């Protein structure tokens, strides 16, 4: 594994552990909402244990869902902001160290961090995407709860539906963290390359594993000028990176993720056709 690939790999590994904290935030919100909805259903049941849709009931449910997800949105944003700032700093510092830059870029880096974290993709920045995901989940759960009540489902069936909805959204949140982190780490490394005075080109490096997409696989091993380099991430959960090319450097080894071993350098296409 190239030193610059390892920087991203190490950051990804550290973040994978932190994502467990994000899952706990989802579990906390899920359990709170389950308790609130159970209390609302119990309060609105008639003597026969039946519950019917009414305006006060829908208001109570909507109010509980809105409050839960407002708090969850704030928690998720704080978590993601911390992950992205740490990811940028680590990628910037380690990349600068590997290239041999020793200047104090503290003031410049603050400007770089703010720009990198808030940069939009397709017109939306990370806070927009967090809000969109949380809002979609809130609406889906609200509608699913009402559908369960309309169809006469028991409270345990309603609870299962809420848990299922949270499970899907937790995966989407983890994917968003990985995708945004890939973007910020790439921004940090490109900031170092562009300001180094020694890096003029980069090499696209994909991952040697069977689920690497054709787009990334086709670009693997290709050289690009700094100002014509592909944007990373190429897609959600992208694990590619850009390696600096200095003087006559050529890669000699790389990691084979399918076997967890180091091999003599070959491109993804060559690896796939072996």
Segments predicted by a language model, with ranges:
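N-terminal leader/targeting and assembly helices and adjacent pre-domain segments
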Residues: 1-161, 248-274
């Amino acid at each position: 594994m190239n030193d610059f690939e390892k920087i991203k790999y190490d950051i990804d590994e550290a973040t994978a552990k932190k994502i467990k904290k994000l899952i706990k935030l989802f579990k906390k919100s899920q359990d709170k909402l389950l308790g609130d909805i159970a209390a609302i259903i119990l309060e609105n049941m008639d003597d026969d244990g039946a519950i019917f849709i009414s305006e006060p009931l829908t208001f109570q449910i909507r109010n509980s869902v809105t409050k839960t997800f407002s708090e969850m949105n704030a928690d998720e944003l704080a978590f993601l902001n911390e992950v992205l700032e740490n990811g940028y700093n680590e990628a910037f510092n380690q990349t600068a160290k590997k290239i041999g830059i020793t200047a104090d870029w503290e003031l410049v880096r603050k400007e770089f961090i703010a720009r990198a974290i808030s940069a939009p993709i397709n017109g939306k920045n990370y806070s927009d995407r967090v809000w969109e995901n949380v809002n979609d989940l809130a609406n889906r759960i609200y509608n699913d709860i009402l559908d369960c009540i309309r169809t006469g489902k028991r409270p345990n069936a309603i609870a299962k539906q809420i848990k299922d909805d949270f499970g899907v959204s937790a995966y989407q949140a983890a994917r968003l963290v990985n995708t945004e982190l890939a973007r910020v780490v790439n921004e940090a490394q490109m900031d170092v390359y562009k300001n180094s005075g020694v890096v003029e080109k980069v090499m696209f490096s994909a991952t040697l594993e069977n689920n690497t997409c054709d787009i990334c696989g086709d670009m693997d091993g290709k050289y690009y000028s700094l100002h014509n380099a592909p944007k990373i991430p190429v897609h959600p959960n992208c694990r590619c990176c850009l390696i600096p090319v200095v003087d006559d450097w050529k890669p000699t080894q790389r990691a084979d993720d399918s076997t967890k071993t180091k091999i003599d350098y070959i491109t993804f296409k060559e690896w796939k056709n072996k």
